[in-house]
């Protein structure tokens, strides 16, 4: 029996099979490791790699494409990469570095990639944001006009900071730079400000101490800590500040006020120098690569006070720079000074002389903060910077002059008392009303007959007296942030009453 083959039936079966055939075809951009070591990998292939693209190695290590050269791609590793071997494959992910952000980050300690490192479990992020985001444009911003109170009298009176400002904290090691930053975070309690503290290249014990201080003061309730310690790869130390800015940006675009501390950018620049030299990029001044200015400018330009249309949010940046022997003319300090809106200069001489915070009012400046200063503070702080500057000049002159006239002696005496009342203990920020009261007492001669060694005791007692509610001054100034005639009258009465009590008990 012959089998009759019907071509139309066979062709319809083949067509049916073709239509049902569904094999998934994956197109991958794959390369091969040519060389690996010192946190750097050179990869052959990856023709379509983007600058800054995430690359995945066989052992699961992630890298970032940095150098796109003619015959290879230079990548920096975001991990140890001990298992990566020459000849192993690398896959381009098609993604740029991004982290998960959201309310769940508040109160947590994360690494430079937004992963929890505080042992409290994973963080459920509400959305992802690129680590490298463009800064807000000119139209998206408005001028700085709201105060960012640090709680430190010397700063709030002479070098005021506004929301959306970039104010550099600069000084030698062990002069109290981190202390000022931490005090500022503690002072934001109850102000509805989200704070981000970025620790770059620091010892794990130092970061643990900072976190403990913030927890003890109840400041972790509104703070995120981003840590890339000294033992982390240079890549993560380089990325940590951008991660901090990205977290703050999420809240800023939600209409909140944020504060970011970068502690410190000198170490970020050193990490970037290390990466660049290993990638064989040409070195420039102090062996830093030519674009080291750009790594800081693109970071600090992300700080802004947003316009009303964009929700009135703000990001205030307090970058920290460590100087060597007070040399502010070195490469990185001059770069960051030129990018920021002013600097708080901490002097090791003042610190060693027991003047803490060791703020040098002569070199320190705030270029935009005066527009944000509260009316009450503006009224009392106008004279203080000038008086202190004159005191410094007179003090230098008085060392050589044997007999001084009465006016000069009085000015020197007042200068000593002003300097004394600006001294402040660590982790004890003051409210606006307290600061205004002690400054008012200083510039209006209420301390002139108080011995210099008793000034601190007097001001502490005065603050306690005002807070006790005996006098209406404290509540009025705290709510209005202005020193009108009524408030001034109440303050004068309080000063006279307290001074009598103080003199009677002294």
Swiss-Prot record:
Annotated EC: 7.1.2.2
Entry's Gene Ontology molecular function annotations: ADP binding; ATP binding; proton-transporting ATP synthase activity, rotational mechanism
Source taxon at top rank: Bacteria
InterPro entries according to UniProt: ATP_synth_asu-like_sf, ATP_synth_asu_C, ATP_synth_asu_C_sf, ATP_synth_F1_a_nt-bd_dom, ATP_synth_F1_asu, ATPase_a/bsu_AS, ATPase_F1/V1/A1_a/bsu_N, ATPase_F1/V1/A1_a/bsu_N_sf
Annotated site residues (Required for activity) in this chain: 364
Keyword Cytoplasm on entry: no
Localization, UniProt: Cellular thylakoid membrane
GO CC term, one of those recorded: plasma membrane-derived thylakoid membrane
Name of the protein in its database record: ATP synthase subunit alpha
